């Protein structure tokens, strides 16, 4: 109880001392400031969300998952040991999103105490209790991950390939936490980088880039999946190659609720995807994945 009281006092001091102004900044700046504050105050692996930051609080005797909104309100605080269990060792926070049906989806990197690295997806109720969990082995070549809720208590999980950057693994979890399907996604002869997974009702819209320097193909791709693993809509836009600019990734603008392409030059600038010219959608491969592929 004493440690929890100390954390509350720290929050009050930070707010009253005006270390940064929450009222005078837009949401993006507030979240950036909040993320900086969390990193300075014993919070590891801070993850940006639409209206909140999730992080691991290491100040107490036991690590806690904490979600704080952009007005410094703590909306979730739960000890990792309450749901990770004793069979695994916590390694890192890989993702955290609010479930559109209520609660939270949290993705952790785990170390099985005697075996290979694992990934754990946990569905938490609004009070932090664990509704279901799915822990599976994580092969090294499947790197960063994206999460999207399906609005029914289930979720989509996207793994990006990091050894050749040409493939993504997509899986869907039912409201009971069962894997309903797994599919690999790739484009013929193109490097595919998925950047954003957004909930669209019960569907997920995946945003990424499909690029080939040799073929002079530089496209953003937008793919909408339903809960049965079917593609229901696609769109491609051409961002070309503009002088010394190059597109590094697609980001989500919280203010406009739209996807933007981030360009890198001597300074950063962005352009809404909607302002890029439409083009033919590239040849896509979507393959059911054998259950032995994790």
Question: Model-found features: residue ranges?
Answer:
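Bacterial N-terminal signal peptides
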Residues: 8-16
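Sec-dependent signal peptide cleavage junction
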Residues: 15-27
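Aromatic (tryptophan-biased) beta-strands that constitute blades/sheets of beta-rich domains
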Residues: 25-39, 64, 71-86, 131-136, ...
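Repeated scaffold domains used in trafficking and secretory/extracellular systems
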Residues: 36-46, 87-98, 140-149, 189-199, ...
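Entry beta-strands of beta-propeller and related beta-repeat scaffolds
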Residues: 49-53, 102-106, 153-157, 202-207, ...
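Short glycine/acidic-enriched loop and turn motifs that connect beta-strands
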Residues: 58-61, 110-115, 161-165, 211-216, ...
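A short loop-to-beta-strand structural motif that recurs across blades of beta-propeller domains
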Residues: 62-66, 118-122, 167-171, 219-223, ...
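Short loop/turn segments that connect beta-strands within beta-propeller blades
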Residues: 69-71, 125-128, 173-178, 225-229, ...
């Amino acid at each position: 109880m004493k440690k929890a009281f100390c954390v509350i006092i720290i929050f009050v001091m930070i707010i009253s001392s005006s270390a940064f102004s929450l009222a005078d900044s837009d949401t993006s700046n507030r979240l950036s400031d909040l993320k900086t504050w969390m990193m300075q105050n014993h919070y590891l692996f801070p993850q940006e969300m639409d209206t909140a930051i999730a992080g691991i609080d290491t100040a107490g005797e036991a690590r806690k998952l904490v979600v704080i909104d952009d007005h410094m309100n703590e909306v979730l605080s739960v000890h990792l040991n309450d749901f990770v269990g004793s069979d695994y060792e916590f390694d890192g926070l890989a993702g955290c999103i609010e479930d559109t049906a209520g609660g939270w989806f949290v993705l952790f990197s785990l170390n099985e105490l005697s075996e290979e690295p694992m990934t754990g997806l946990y569905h938490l109720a609004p009070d932090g209790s664990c509704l279901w969990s799915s822990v599976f082995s994580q092969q090294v070549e499947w790197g960063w991950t994206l999460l999207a809720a399906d609005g029914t208590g289930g979720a989509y999980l996207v793994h990006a390939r990091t050894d050749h950057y040409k493939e993504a693994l997509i899986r869907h979890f039912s409201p009971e936490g069962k894997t309903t399907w797994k599919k690999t996604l790739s484009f013929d002869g193109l490097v595919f980088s998925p950047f954003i997974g957004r909930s669209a009702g019960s569907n997920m819209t995946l945003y990424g880039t499909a690029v080939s320097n040799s073929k002079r193909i530089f496209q953003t791709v937008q793919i909408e999946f339903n809960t049965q693993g079917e593609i229901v809509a696609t769109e491609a836009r051409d961002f070309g190659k503009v002088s010394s600019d190059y597109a590094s990734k697609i980001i989500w603008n919280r203010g406009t609720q739209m996807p933007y392409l981030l360009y890198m030059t001597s300074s950063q600038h962005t352009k809404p995807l909607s302002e890029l010219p439409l083009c033919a959608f590239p040849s896509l491969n979507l393959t059911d994945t054998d259950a032995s592929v994790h």
